[in-house]
């Protein structure tokens, strides 16, 4: 069973957790997700959260344009991060319907995380692969569609993704 429940970009319960994430832009801001298409998940205890953003490829400057992006994940729960990551990918797949060709990527800033031999180790354990680095030096990790778990809905109330306008309906 999936441990995630669907949330939203300005969930006041998630703000304190988001404020403790290393890439937080403005501490205390009521919104913590990047602009545009996104899926926000939280655990029922609000001790972990996840954001999948899906920026339009034309606005992306990194090499993985078109991919879903895990723009934030913080786990302060007892659950294994690698398990929560796989579940979040499964929920993202259920939410959007099918994965883009580039799959999902995440970026790890090794200057702002604890020094480790394998940056993003929990993502690697979840099935992501090393995909290179950004021009800014962030480690890029990627999960291709063939490696994704089967789609699963989040627990609780479910609101499926609906494009805001026809131009959002993208064919791969």
Regions found by a protein language model. Name each.
Residues 1-86, 90-107, 112-116, 121-172:
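Non-catalytic substrate-recognition and accessory regions of acyl/acetyltransferase enzymes
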């Amino acid at each position: 069973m999936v441990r995630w429940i669907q949330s939203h970009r300005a969930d006041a319960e998630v703000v304190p957790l988001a404020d403790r994430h290393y890439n937080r832009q403005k501490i205390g801001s009521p919104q913590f997700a990047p602009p545009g298409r996104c899926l926000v998940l939280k655990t029922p205890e609000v001790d972990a959260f996840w954001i999948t953003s899906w920026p339009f490829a034309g606005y992306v400057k990194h090499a993985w344009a078109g991919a879903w992006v895990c723009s934030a994940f913080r786990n302060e729960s007892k659950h294994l991060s690698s398990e929560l990551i796989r579940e979040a990918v499964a929920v993202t797949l259920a939410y959007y319907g099918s994965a883009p060709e580039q799959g999902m990527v995440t970026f790890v800033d090794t200057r702002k995380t604890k020094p480790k031999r394998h940056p993003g180790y929990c993502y690697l354990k979840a099935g992501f692969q090393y995909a290179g680095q950004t021009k800014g030096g962030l480690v890029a990790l990627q999960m291709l569609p063939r490696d994704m778990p089967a789609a699963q809905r989040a627990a609780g109330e479910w609101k499926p993704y609906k494009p805001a306008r026809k131009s959002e309906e993208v064919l791969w």
